Amino acid sequence: MQLNASEISDLIKQRIGKFDLGVESRSEGTIVSLTDGIVRIHGLQDVMQGEMVEFPGNTYGMALNLERDSVGAVVLGSYEHLSEGDTAKCTGRILEVPVGEALLGRVVDALGNPIDGAGPIDAKLFSPIEKIAPGVISRQSVSQPLQTGLKAIDSMIPVGRGQRELIIGDRQTGKTAIAIDAIINQKGTGVKCIYVAVGQKQSSIANVVRKLQEHGAMEHTIVVSASASESAALQFIAPYAGCAMGEYFRDRGEDALIVYDDLTKQAWAYRQISLLLRRPPGREAYPGDVFYLHSRLLERASRINAEEVERLTKGEVKGKTGSLTALPIIETQAGDVSAFVPTNVISITDGQIFLETNLFNAGIRPAVNAGLSVSRVGGAAQTKVIKKLGGGIRLDLAQYRELAAFAQFASDLDEATRKQIERGQRVTELMKQNQYSPMSIAQMAVSLFAANEGYLDDIEVSKVRDFEDALQEYMKSQCAELLKSIDATGDYNDAIQAGLHEAIKKFKATHAW
């Protein structure tokens, strides 16, 4: 085979043309110390705050401390194979997690990797875990209700879409139970849910997932797990990862609900990281920016207006507002709400549901303290029928608690006080509700109407729950159309009032319980 001289010269010219003289510079450093998941790196000149740092063995870290002659980074995952002298490289990327519909029904870790054994997740989109919250102009006021299905909350402490409502109480007071009931109640409403478990036992997380599957709620839920056995770094970033997954739905004109269970453990993890990074400790040994830790997370829960949704979707979605509702959970020690983290989160959120150990142990569940619980913006979003019927319930309960304490010392009470105490006892009994049995708007309306109109006054306190159960069964079978109309419109008018009066009178005349 003979080669033509012109062919050879053409070939050489092609090769020369394709030759790339570009120089790629990459910042590299050396690990100088490695203790408790904290890496000190010397020589990383161009690293950003929060940037991903690459270590040998496909391991990554996150740069948190940028100092004059070294960088302090936290390793995400196991670090047993790393040692002093290893190379660390800048990636130029901020930590991202997969987002989108593909994650629904799955259990993932804080980095978005599946841990439920159901195969890989085919996620097309990724989102940075840290984002700036929507500005004032992008937001819209809270005006749509988010029904939790719990009488005590929807009637007295209503939650709106886009609100941040804190659930606070000691351990074993039913905080997680309220959040799980709220997730179960979103079935069929189109609201997507994200449950972020931080520092929980793996058995507890598995139990939550099983309950969600049993009640058909896993189809619209993503579970993000950073259990107690995970590193402090993963417990610290898990809530931000969950928030990024929720923002995907909000920014496309949908509604999402995120539960952080719980932010106390995230604050502990952040304190641990900060102390290992040798940041100066402050009150209760927390670092100075622990308020910012929670405020930048919770401010991302919001309701954004249609113009912002249209801008974010580049015109694909028009005329729809999006919302991300947050239910952060905080665990108190012996009911002390004046501790550092509880006061911080109370001041950031739009209200709190305060759960008491004494009420829980007395069998009043959910153990909501009506006097200390408040919803600062949810009233504007409350369903009309519940707002009308539940208005006096909160006052009745708060006054009853006050009088009940006083009545222990007084032997003879006047008629008005005695009536108020008796009414309070019945309302307290009525507010009790079993776990995993959320109620519809119409069912709540029936129970509240019966209490308001005095239909419980001649019922023994111990029989109130039986009366309510029997009444609900009767309404379901005999007055299905009335219930359907209340659920459909959420309105309260003379026709509905007359219908409820007639139905309850007929029930009391013909039924025993």
Curated annotation (Swiss-Prot):
It catalyses: ATP + H2O + 4 H(+)(in) = ADP + phosphate + 5 H(+)(out). ATP binds at residues 169-176. One of its GO terms (cellular component) is proton-transporting ATP synthase complex. One of its GO terms (molecular function) is proton-transporting ATP synthase activity, rotational mechanism. Gene3D superfamilies: 2.40.30.20, ATP synthase alpha/beta chain, C-terminal domain, P-loop containing nucleotide triphosphate hydrolases. Signal peptide: none annotated. Keywords: ATP synthesis, ATP-binding, Cell inner membrane, Cell membrane, CF(1), Hydrogen ion transport, Ion transport, Membrane, Nucleotide-binding, Translocase, Transport. The record marks 373 as: Required for activity. It is a peripheral membrane protein. It comes from the Bacteria. It is an enzyme of class 7 (translocase). Its EC number is 7.1.2.2. It is found in: Cell inner membrane. PROSITE patterns: ATPASE_ALPHA_BETA (PS00152). Produces ATP from ADP in the presence of a proton gradient across the membrane. The alpha chain is a regulatory subunit. Belongs to the ATPase alpha/beta chains family. F-type ATPases have 2 components, CF(1) - the catalytic core - and CF(0) - the membrane proton channel. CF(1) has five subunits: alpha(3), beta(3), gamma(1), delta(1), epsilon(1). CF(0) has three main subunits: a(1), b(2) and c(9-12). The alpha and beta chains form an alternating ring which encloses part of the gamma chain. CF(1) is attached to CF(0) by a central stalk formed by the gamma and epsilon chains, while a peripheral stalk is formed by the delta and b chains. PANTHER family: ATP SYNTHASE SUBUNIT ALPHA, MITOCHONDRIAL. HAMAP family: ATP_synth_alpha_bact (MF_01346). This is ATP synthase subunit alpha 1. It comes from Methylococcus capsulatus (strain ATCC 33009 / NCIMB 11132 / Bath). The gene is atpA1.
